[in-house]
Amino acid sequence: MQGDSSPSPTTTSSPLIRPINRNVIHRICSGQVILDLSSAVKELVENSLDAGATSIEINLRDYGEDYFQVIDNGCGISPTNFKVLALKHHTSKLEDFTDLLNLTTYGFRGEALSSLCALGNLTVETRTKNEPVATLLTFDHSGLLTAEKKTARQIGTTVTVRKLFSNLPVRSKEFKRNIRKEYGKLVSLLNAYALIAKGVRFVCSNTTGKNPKSVVLNTQGRGSLKDNIITVFGISTFTSLQPVSICVSEDCRVEGFLSKPGQGTGRNLADRQYFFINGRPVDMPKVSKLVNELYKDTSSRKYPVTILDFIVPGGACDLNVTPDKRKVFFSDETSVIGSLREGLNEIYSSSNASYIVNRFEENSEQPDKAGVSSFQKKSNLLSEGIVLDVSSKTRLGEAIEKENPSLREVEIDNSSPMEKFKFEIKACGTKKGEGSLSVHDVTHLDKTPSKGLPQLNVTEKVTDASKDLSSRSSFAQSTLNTFVTMGKRKHENISTILSETPVLRNQTSSYRVEKSKFEVRALASRCLVEGDQLDDMVISKEDMTPSERDSELGNRISPGTQADNVERHEREHEKPIRFEEPTSDNTLTKGDVERVSEDNPRCSQPLRSVATVLDSPAQSTGPKMFSTLEFSFQNLRTRRLERLSRLQSTGYVSKCMNTPQPKKCFAAATLELSQPDDEERKARALAAATSELERLFRKEDFRRMQVLGQFNLGFIIAKLERDLFIVDQHAADEKFNFEHLARSTVLNQQPLLQPLNLELSPEEEVTVLMHMDIIRENGFLLEENPSAPPGKHFRLRAIPYSKNITFGVEDLKDLISTLGDNHGECSVASSYKTSKTDSICPSRVRAMLASRACRSSVMIGDPLRKNEMQKIVEHLADLESPWNCPHGRPTMRHLVDLTTLLTLPDDDNVNDDDDDDATISLA
């Protein structure tokens, strides 16, 4: 053709085949080895691990765009290897191809450093144990050594790469644009090595601009996979995992951790799934798909946390498939996947589910003791005639003599708005045999009135009943401005009696003080006042004039006894209690209690008596106002006996005394190990805590559940032994109807008047030939025409329908795609019909059945009788997978462990024989 300047094939000779320039080869091949930032750092980290390093530090500048370096404490590089260190295909780990069968190192090709030289500026700083100083090596882009320089460094190696991809313009621009994404991939990859490398400490940090170094990964180099998981992901993630050990064959096994079956253990993304072969991180998409689909059968749409290490002999797999060594071939993949599926089925069986135990959320004020037990013990003291001699002189216990001074905070808790107080109590010792005062002794008060404020009166008392001292916290009952009635509770009921005095244990109130104005010297630093001891203490300042108060006080104070005691204690005890004066007239109401935040367990020891003296450095400028204390122990004893009689008449006390009392709840879950380095102890404690904090629920347990009632016209409250569960009535009934429809629904087949020609890809045609029986079971009838052109070998002759819903070509292609994704023998997708066969259905078929089941189920807002609720719960026991409705909603949740509603005091001095004194009724 005229005007065509292109050479004719007949007149032009074929081009000559010439060798490619070495530099061009180097750059082309290097770009295939180092694909991104994560692959570059991966090669350096693997070199450090092969060198036996126990500490690896990765430092990046501007997320690796400027430079990145890997620092280790490995064996270092000997001077004889300096010149060949970065040459292509030079390695010390492989001599013959057969060595691949027994490979124990991460690297074996000798391409990493050579490729990094071609794509960036490489420097290496290294020292062995035989060298006195380190050497800094500089290489050019071809891998040749250009400079050596002596420098100071510990034994090990530091590899620095600057300006990665700088000599590849397109790759460099793409690298800079996605640098944050590349950095995220790198951190995820380092997590994999930090998990599997036992005894190796990893630190990864990044520095941006003039900002300080930011550490994103810091492990401790523990010696077990369990400890590495806790370090990298935290204890909360580890508690949701369970160990896995599956024997695939005689010489192959799988070990690691998987998310526990049940709700609340998975993740919304599959971002924490790590697979290893003999400790090498690899990609295993088929295993990942298998685990995900089995897990979703029990936990809705979540993805499990997966950490699995395949321990196989060297000849059972091929690692030399891709340049990054992430793709692996098994010699017998089918048997490996099949054996793994059988082992995972035992873990993610649809007949079991794990529920996180919900504790009873107590208020910030926790009961000091088990109410029934405390009440019974105090009542027994009174009923048996054990009466304390309140007028006798008693001595302080020896416990005060040995106690070291310590600071304590006494906090006032008031339900009504009032000013804030802060008391600073300093412990003081006393000599044995000194300082005895009667309980009836009235404290001396000398205070200067300010702005018409009433006087501050404090009276502290101690009971000698040793069994009431089981709590580690001390209670102080004090009064401000006036004495408070604690016993005139006209409308008290059983619940009030059983929770006498709440206490904040080991917590600090928000009440704070800046300085103190009054100084109180105390005989002792610890005191205990039970609420019942002040039942009859009723003093009102409106009922007495100041002169009457002075007269009453004068009658009660004997100058020959009380004044001497006061003077002696002022001389001997110099560690004060300071109060801050309120800024307004404040009066404690009924139930106001001082709470002592006490960390010293010795403070739970009983004291004999306490007298408190208040003294003010200021001189009195006005009339003194006092309140006297009227108290009769006989009246208190009578009141307590009457209360006990009322409870006995109702049968409440006898029922509690005849039922064993539960142990302290969640003791193992809150236990602090005294020997954190004891692995066996930690393992036992972790197992005990796990058993307390989760419940393994089996399908058969639905038949044993007792329905208690309906909540909010939408949920069923049921009890199983000591646990309460809440069941979603709509989701539970919907799942029952869904599985019933899946078993009973038959898809009818509608022949087409004119067959439809299908346009399928070659891969789809192969899938159709492999799974023709499953396609036919779903109602599609295909006709094959081998003489047709490629892509048109099949024609559709019939389509399925159900009632008014018809399925067509798009549903057939959806079914073919599902079958292709499951790769035949690896198929684990659940069937909409029954678990006996692995038949798969189009997504629209499942959606149709789910919609019908939803519309025919009990709705939220429907009132149900008890027998109807029991029927819904029992139906769940007959289902294949009763844990989620077809739309993913959980059918049941753990509500509360009933034993947490009543707990024993946290006291080591309580005998086990006392456990039978009280209980809680779970009925």
From Swiss-Prot:
Tissue: Expressed at very low levels in mature leaves. Detected in rapidly dividing tissues.
Phenotype upon gene inactivation: Reduced fertility. Increased homeologous recombination frequency.
Listed name of the protein: DNA mismatch repair protein PMS1
PROSITE patterns linked to this entry: DNA_MISMATCH_REPAIR_1
Biased composition (Basic and acidic residues): 543-553, 565-581, 591-601
GO cellular component, one term: mismatch repair complex
Annotated localization: Nucleus
Organism: Arabidopsis thaliana (Mouse-ear cress)
SMART domains associated with the record: DNA_mis_repair, MutL_C
Gene from which this protein is expressed: PMS1
Family, per entry: Belongs to the DNA mismatch repair MutL/HexB family.
Family matches, as PANTHER family: DNA MISMATCH REPAIR PROTEIN MLH, PMS, MUTL, MISMATCH REPAIR ENDONUCLEASE PMS2
